[in-house]
């Protein structure tokens, strides 16, 4: 054993040396056996972004092959300098394809260099993989061999749009670099802002070759505009210059809003501290990478290897692009990686170019398929191409401060703005973002629109009208052709502007043609304000929902409502049956039935109490009862009733008749004396059924309202002035005129001031918001003007203006009528009739109870013999002298043998003295 241990210890170092030599030889053999695949890189030298990206590519391939040692392919990089020019990039790519026969190219670094490389790759079937060419315009080339291993700029447009919408800014100005990169985002911005009704007032293009003075001149131009929301889309080198000059001329002060795209926000790490100071208060939209395990490990390795150089988003995309290419190359390792070169006829020197003998990569289609389907979890998130590019789902909203950037929220696809990624509900309010420090070091949200003090005069459009000139009238001097604008609306606007807290210069521009005719409808005038031809519109412009999509209206300054106006007719022709009109048909029937009911109840009560009534013939009974019942109407009963119950019922019934007759008399008097004039038509439905012609003002929105109410379009007539309306009314529908007019209250009042007693307003009154001044969406003038309108309407200024233009119309407001005088119906007297019915039923029950009681008392007394009854009858002989009274005895009881000496039923007692005097 000792000998064995001695040999092992002696030759251990030798055995280890032999093993290491064997391992190195094996690795060298495997490396030599791996397929060398040439890949080109076209990036600019001496550029921080390109340098960081190239480091990331080398680091990605090194770590990938160390992890996947058994792969049969190895990418060999061929790096060419683009010289930061389009021509340099094109020459580099042509060299790599033609001379080096690379199977793929990573690059170029900018969107401007990409178009030629894309066409070159498409022709040679060499995939062009770019991690930094983000312009959406490159998609228009429609080359399948262009792989965008990054997001295009259109993906952030929705995030920018959400910010604008959340703060309710209505106008923006994009400031962009004047090249393919800057212009590429504009179509997407326009579409996104149109969806939320945000207007792009101006597009500011700044060339890379502009001097500082030229940039300053452009910024001064922006200062003269009212818009204060700017969206900056450019790279950091030009962006730093822009913000430095903007800071110098005080455009980063209170009231301004600056938003930068990810062209600057993603590269904040390579910008100096001075740039951050100049951008204090700026908002940024930055690409968001989740802090995955892969990203954290890469950042640690990056810091260890390169020290203070920060890993940015483009370096992450470059890292993932190299990994994806290595995986795809390994997948097609069995494919021929050579080029198929076709000789061209170059015998003529004048047609020979560098594109001659440009080969076609045999591996191109297979490599393209592999790249399109590769999927893995990279450092920048899931690497999976869709339509040849990566898709962005989340952006980070940052607030730039002097010390760096601060996250204030996020934008998530299909969710919107959120304060935290843990919140999945869409935010429609800026409060869902964290507090923001705005330019000027303020936390108050800028309005986004200010009236510049050095601006030119506002161009205020006024309508050209052929009538109703009390509201707006445009006249032109025959010699100078200078327009003069007057009217109620103009005086209101002038008064409002004179009370504004700041001076506003404006001029009236008639909305007419060169020959002085109206240029179009009010809708067209409002739409031209939206298009920017005018800075506002003043006149009798009604506030409508469809118009509010294009302009902002100040508060209304006129009365509201739309009504029908019809002629009135003489109400003295009442007809022969006017006396029936105070009561409705139902009330007449109820009253007649009540008389019949009262008669029946009287019959019942009197039948039990009146012997004379019982002895009458049936026809006499009926006539007596109903005569008695109806005579109560005039309180003229011929004879008193014999029944206590009848008397009570008659008292209640007379009370009801008193109220009924008094109400009838009052209503009939009103019909015969008060109502002298009545509208020819009482309701809109009657107009629709009658099919008469209806007038409306030319160019008014009331035409659409009439069509919506299903009025026949062929029956609608137009008028331009009160005089034309009057003329149409005189002709009537039968002669091509009108029998009704549909217009706003303000115009109807003006017409009624002249013809108050001849026309009337009928129901219903339709809602409208009145007249308002129109301004561009988001205009700060709207709130200030609305405040001044409230001030003058609450004071005496508005009354003075109204008296100036509409004096004498106020008394006509009472001519508005409703239907004919209200008839009395049975509902008004339900309680009285119910009282009569209840009282009658109670009396009937009392009568029946009393009769039953008497019957029981009588049955309890013994009956007299016949002879006693006869004796009693002879004794009294129908009339007895009781003291000094003559007594009339009920003979019926005597005949029924129910009369005793103790009980003598007396029907009527009369003093003897009265009979003697008679």
Curated annotation (Swiss-Prot):
* Topological domains, Extracellular: 31-586, 669-828
Which superkingdom does the taxonomy of this entry point to?
A: Eukaryota
What is the residue range of the signal peptide feature? 1-30
Q: How does this protein lie in the membrane?
A: Multi-pass membrane protein
> Which residues face the membrane's Cytoplasmic side?
608-616, 638-647, 850-918
What cystine pairs are annotated?
A: none
Q: What is this protein called?
A: Glutamate receptor 2.5
């Amino acid at each position: 054993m000792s000998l064995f241990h001695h040999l092992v210890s002696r030759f251990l170092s030798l055995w280890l040396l032999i093993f290491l030599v064997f391992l190195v030889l094996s690795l060298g053999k495997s490396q030599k056996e791996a397929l060398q695949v040439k890949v080109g890189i076209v990036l600019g030298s001496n550029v921080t972004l390109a340098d960081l990206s190239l480091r990331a590519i080398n680091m990605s391939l090194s770590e990938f092959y160390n992890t996947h040692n058994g792969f049969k392919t190895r990418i060999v990089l061929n790096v060419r300098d683009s010289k930061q020019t389009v021509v340099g990039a094109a020459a580099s790519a042509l060299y790599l394809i033609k001379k080096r026969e690379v199977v793929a190219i990573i690059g170029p670094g900018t969107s401007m260099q990409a178009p030629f490389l894309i066409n070159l790759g498409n022709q040679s079937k060499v995939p062009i993989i770019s991690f930094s060419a983000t312009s959406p315009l490159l998609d228009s080339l429609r080359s399948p061999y262009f792989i965008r291993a990054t997001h295009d700029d259109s993906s952030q447009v929705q995030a920018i749009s959400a910010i604008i919408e959340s703060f309710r800014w209505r106008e923006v100005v994009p400031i962009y670099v004047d090249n393919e990169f800057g212009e590429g985002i504009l179509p997407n911005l326009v579409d996104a802002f149109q969806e939320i009704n945000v207007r792009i007032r101006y597009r500011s293009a700044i060339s890379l070759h502009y001097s500082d003075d030229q940039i300053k001149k452009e910024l001064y131009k922006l200062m003269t505009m009212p818009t204060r929301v700017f969206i900056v889309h450019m790279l950091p080198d030009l962006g730093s210059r822009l913000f430095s000059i903007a800071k110098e001329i005080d455009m980063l002060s209170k009231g301004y809003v600056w938003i930068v795209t990810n062209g600057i926000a993603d590269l904040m790490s390579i910008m100096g501290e001075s740039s951050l100071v100049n951008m204090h208060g700026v908002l940024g939209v930055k690409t968001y990478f989740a802090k995955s395990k892969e990203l954290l490990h890469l950042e640690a390795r990056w810091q260890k290897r390169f020290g203070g150089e920060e890993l940015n988003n483009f370096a992450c995309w470059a890292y993932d692009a190299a990994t994806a290419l290595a995986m795809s190359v390994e997948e097609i390792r069995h494919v021929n990686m050579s080029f198929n070169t076709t000789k061209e006829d170059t015998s003529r020197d004048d047609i020979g170019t560098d594109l001659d003998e440009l080969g076609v990569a045999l591996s191109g289609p297979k490599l393209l398929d592999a790249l399109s389907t590769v999927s893995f979890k990279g450092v920048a998130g899931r690497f999976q191409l869709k339509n040849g590019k990566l898709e962005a789902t989340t952006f980070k909203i940052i607030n730039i401060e002097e010390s760096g950037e601060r996250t204030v929220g996020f934008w998530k696809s299909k969710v919107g703005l959120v304060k935290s990624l843990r919140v999945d509900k869409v935010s429609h309010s800026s409060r869902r973002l964290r507090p923001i420090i705005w330019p000027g070091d303020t936390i108050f949200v800028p309005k986004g629109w200010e009236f510049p003090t050095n601006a030119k005069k506002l161009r205020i459009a006024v309508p050209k009208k052929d009538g109703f000139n009390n509201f707006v009238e445009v006249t032109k001097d025959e010699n100078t052709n200078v327009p003069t604008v007057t009217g109620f609306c103009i005086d209101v606007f002038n008064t409002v502007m004179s009370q504004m807290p700041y001076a506003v210069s404006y001029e009236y521009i008639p909305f007419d043609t060169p020959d002085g005719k109206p240029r179009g409808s009010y809708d067209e005038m409002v739409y031209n304000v939206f298009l920017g031809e005018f800075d506002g519109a003043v006149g009798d412009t009604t506030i409508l929902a469809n118009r509010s999509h294009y302009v902002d209206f100040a508060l209304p300054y006129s009365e509201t409502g739309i009504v029908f106006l019809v002629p009135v007719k003489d109400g003295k022709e009442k007809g022969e049956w006017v006396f029936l009109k105070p009561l409705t048909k139902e009330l007449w029937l109820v009253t007649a039935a009540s008389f019949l009911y009262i008669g029946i109840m009287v019959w019942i009560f009197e039948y039990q109490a009146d012997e004379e009534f019982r002895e009458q013939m049936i026809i006499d009974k009926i006539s007596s009862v109903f005569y008695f019942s109806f005579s109560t109407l005039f309180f003229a009963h011929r004879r008193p009733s014999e029944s206590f119950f009848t008397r009570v019922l008659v008292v209640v019934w007379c009370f009801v008749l008193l109220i009924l007759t008094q109400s009838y008399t009052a209503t009939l008097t009103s019909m015969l004396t008060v109502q002298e004039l009545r509208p020819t038509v009482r309701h809109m439905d009657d107009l629709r059924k009658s099919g008469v012609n209806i007038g409306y003002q030319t160019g008014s929105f009331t035409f659409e309202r009439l069509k919506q109410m299903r009025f026949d379009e062929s029956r609608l007539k137009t008028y331009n002035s009160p005089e034309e309306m009057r003329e149409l009314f005189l002709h009537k529908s039968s002669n091509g005129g009108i029998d009704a007019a549909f217009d706003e209250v303000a115009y109807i009042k003006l017409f009624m001031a002249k013809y108050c007693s001849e026309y009337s307003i009928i129901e219903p009154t339709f809602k409208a918001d009145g007249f308002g001044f129109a301004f561009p969406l988001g205009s700060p003038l709207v709130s200030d003007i609305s405040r001044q309108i409230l001030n003058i309407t609450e004071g005496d200024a508005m009354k003075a203006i109204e008296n100036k233009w509409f004096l004498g119309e106020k008394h006509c407001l009472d001519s508005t009528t409703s239907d004919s005088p209200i008839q009395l119906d049975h509902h008004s007297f339900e309680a009285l009739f119910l009282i009569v019915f209840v009282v009658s039923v109670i009396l009937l029950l009392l009568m029946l109870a009393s009769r039953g009681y008497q019957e029981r008392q009588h049955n309890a007394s013994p009956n007299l013999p016949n002879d006693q009854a006869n004796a009693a009858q002879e004794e009294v002989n129908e009339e007895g002298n009781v003291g000094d009274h003559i007594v009339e005895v009920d003979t019926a009881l005597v005949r029924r043998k129910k009369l005793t000496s103790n009980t003598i039923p007396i029907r009527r007692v009369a003093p003897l003295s009265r009979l003697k005097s008679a």
